[in-house]
Amino acid sequence: VHSANDSLKRLEIGASLSAAELLSICSLLEAAKRVKAFSRSEKEEVPDDSLTGFFTEIEPLTPLYDEIRRCILAEDEIADDASSTLRSIRRSMRGMNDRIRAQMNNMINNSTTRSYLQDAVITMRDGRYCLPVKAEAKSQIPGMVHDQSSSGSTLFIEPMAVVNLNNEYKELLLKEKDEIEKILENLSRLTANFSEQIATDYTILAELDF
C-alpha cells in the first residue's frame, strides 16, 4: 500500500487532491476492507491475539470508497454522472462535436475541397478541429492556421465555417475542466473528514506489511 501521508498533509491545509491521489486512497481502503473481512472470518476460528487490536481499529470507510469510485473511473477519467452539471456539459459537448464533424465531413466529401487536402481526415490542434491542407492550397480553404507538418507541406487549418462552433466547443471544454475541479474539491473535502481514520488504516496496514 502506498503511503497516504503526503495526501493527508495536503488535506490538512485545505488543498484539493488529484484524481490519482484519491484513487490511491481508495486502494488503501480496499486493502483495509480485505483485512477487515479476513479478521472477521478468522475471529470465529482463532482466539483473540495480539492482532485483535489492529483488526478492531481498522475501518474500510466503504461509503467514502464508493463515492470516490463512483466519480473517478481512472486517473484521467471522471464519470459523466459524477455531477448533474458535468453530465449536462458533456451532453452539450457531444452534440457540438457531432455538429462540427458533420460540417467538416461535408467539406471533405466535396471533391473540390478534398483535392486541397493532404488527407481526407479531421484532426485536432490546440483543442480545435482542423483539416490537413496542402500548403500550396492554403488560399483555397479560408480559415485559421494552427500548426504545420515538420516538412511544411501540410498546414492544419481550422475552416472559417466552423470557427464559431469550435469557439463554443472550447468554452464547453473550459466548463468541463472547472466542473471536474469542483468535483475533486468536493471529494477532497469529504475525504478530509476521515483523515484520522485513513491515517490509522495506513499505519495498521504498514505494520501488517500489507
Please annotate each region the language model reported:
Residues 89, 93-96, 176-183, 187-208:
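Intracellular alpha-helical coupling/juxtamembrane segments of multi-pass membrane proteins
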Residues 60-73, 164-185:
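Extended, charged coiled-coil "arm/hinge" scaffolds of SMC/Rad50-like chromosome-maintenance ATPases
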Residues 40-43, 47, 104, 108-111, ...:
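Coiled-coil heptad-register positions
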Residues 1-85, 89, 194-197, 201-210:
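Conserved amphipathic alpha-helical "coupling/scaffold" segments
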Residues 121, 125-156, 166:
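SMC-family hinge/dimerization module
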Residues 87-137:
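Extended, Lys/Arg-enriched charged tracts that mediate electrostatic binding to polyanionic substrates
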Residues 75-89, 148-154, 169, 184-194:
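Short hinge/gating elements
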Residues 46-57, 156-157, 162-167, 186-190:
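Long amphipathic alpha-helical coiled-coil segments
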